[in-house]
Design a protein with these regions (language model features):
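Positively charged n-region of N-terminal signal peptides that target proteins for export
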Residues: 1-8
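Bacterial N-terminal signal peptides
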Residues: 9-20
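N-terminal "domain-start" segment that seeds a small globular fold
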Residues: 24-48
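Active-site acidic short loop of glycosyltransferases
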Residues: 52-54, 119-121
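Hydrophobic beta-strand anchors of alpha/beta hydrolase catalytic cores
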Residues: 57-58, 88, 157
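Conserved redox-active cysteine motifs that mediate thiol-disulfide chemistry
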Residues: 60-77
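Structural microenvironment flanking redox-active thiols in thiol-disulfide oxidoreductases
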Residues: 72-119, 125, 131-135
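Thiol/disulfide oxidoreductase modules built on the thioredoxin-like
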Residues: 119, 127-182
């Protein structure tokens, strides 16, 4: 097997592992985020402007992310129990633009993945060309993106309050991540 091909998954795993407990809370310096629109896997359009007054939770993932397999079902169950399921978006933004992957996620891979972890397609969005990722990154939602390039750590959860301001960014979730999300909702 080509050793070069083995480097990328190892590098990705190490970045995720080493930075998995990094948390940035922006509660004091709330960044205003721009509005956005994105389609879910069922074809329905989500427009953030129609959700003003309600918090939004965005969870960025990719299909080969081991921590995502644990975080996503737990977050889905938590948001369901809180009655906030309509404000939860799982966003796959693992695209060629990151330049660390030869084989980006596809809609088919995402559907297989979410079937495996039992997440309904209405909650899952495919940021195929990285538009939402870029908007959020340029707005400061991913502090590590400036430090290490365009890479966003996975899973990454951001919470936007009802005024459209960023109140929490968890890059690489870890133990107690649900408590941190609940605290700012």
């Amino acid at each position: 097997m080509n050793k070069t091909l083995l480097k990328y998954p190892i590098i990705i795993f190490l970045l995720i592992f080493l930075l998995s407990l990094n948390e940035v809370s922006l509660a004091q310096d709330q960044t205003q985020l721009p509005s956005f629109r994105i389609r879910n896997l069922s074809g329905e359009l989500f427009d953030s402007r129609k959700h003003l007054g309600k918090p939004l939770v965005l969870s960025f993932f990719f299909t080969r992310c081991p921590p995502c397999r644990k975080e996503m079902p737990a977050l889905h169950q938590f948001m369901s129990q809180e009655g906030l399921l309509e404000e939860l978006l799982f966003v796959d933004s693992y695209v060629k633009a990151l330049k660390i992957v030869d084989e980006p996620d596809t809609e088919r891979k995402i559907k297989n993945f979410i079937n495996l972890i039992k997440i309904p397609p209405e909650r899952v969005y495919f940021d195929e060309i990285g538009t939402l990722l870029k908007i959020m990154s340029q707005s400061g939602a991913f502090p590590n993106a400036k430090r290490i390039g365009t890479l966003v750590l996975y899973p990454t959860i951001i919470v936007i309050n009802g005024s459209g301001k960023l109140v929490l960014s968890l890059e690489g979730t870890g133990p107690g991540f649900l408590d941190k999300v609940k605290k700012v909702l």
